[in-house]
Amino acid sequence: MELSLSIASFPLDSETILDMRELLKMSDRDYSKPLFESSWHLADVPGFAVLAYTENNELLGFAAAADLIGLDSYEWSAFVHPDYRRLTIGSALAGGVAYGLQQRQAVEGLAAFIEEEGAKDFIASLGYQPDFKEIELEAEPLAEFKLPEGLTIIPYDGEIEKLENLMIAAFDEDVLPVVHYNIEKNDREVFVMKREGELVASASLIKEEDESGLWLTAFAVDPIEQGKGYGKAFLLWCRLYAMQQGKKRAVLEVETDNDALTVYRKSGFNPVHTIEYWKKP
């Protein structure tokens, strides 16, 4: 069997996207997130796909890589037809990714795979080493919720210095490009929580185009204000907002060693799967 490998930049054409989606149906697991399915058709997301077609134009595997925050820092993942995983298709796709990253002068190329033994063996065989893990959690939308007295949640109001200080306190200065990216992107909404006019928390929300989910990113509570229930209140409000927007679930990702993991669970968010990130030394 002869295979032809090609690289296509985002946005991908509709026929290719259809082939990729049909291939993903070969698995019971949902690989759409690490493979950036929601970005395949977008012209403003730097990304590309490596495609492995047979001589009969059957797609047997593909990899997808994307730079989600515009800093030349890519993540990538791959999927191969379950009946052909003993071949070297995965390694060929990884080689295509490496070439694509080199052509784009990427400063980083993290591999992201749902945590499972087959994926671990594959990515380790390519010389990658484990870096960190994130748990994807989801919650059902809430039909009713009322913020505690004195708290308000409003769209970002332009007070950039206060927002930057909050995010630096919760993370570090490396988060600032992400903050500005979230503010500038039209497909993201930044909300802030205030207590009697003072900023105490923030989150960025992204609506999945198929109306299935509302993603929470860059969620932060002022460290000085942690432990007072603000984080839980914000998360519950996000579930309410998901209902108001007609979404079927609210979703977020958090590193497995994050101290706030218990807060997410107490707010109704339950684990879906763990994505393991790998890097080359």
Where do the model's predicted regions map?
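Short glycine/proline-centered loop/turn elements that form peptide/ligand docking sites
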Residues: L235, D257-A260, K279
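Flexible, substrate/cofactor-facing loop regions flanked by secondary structure
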Residues: M20-S38, L147-T217
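Short acidic/polar active-site loop segments enriched in Thr and Asp
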Residues: V107, K248, N270
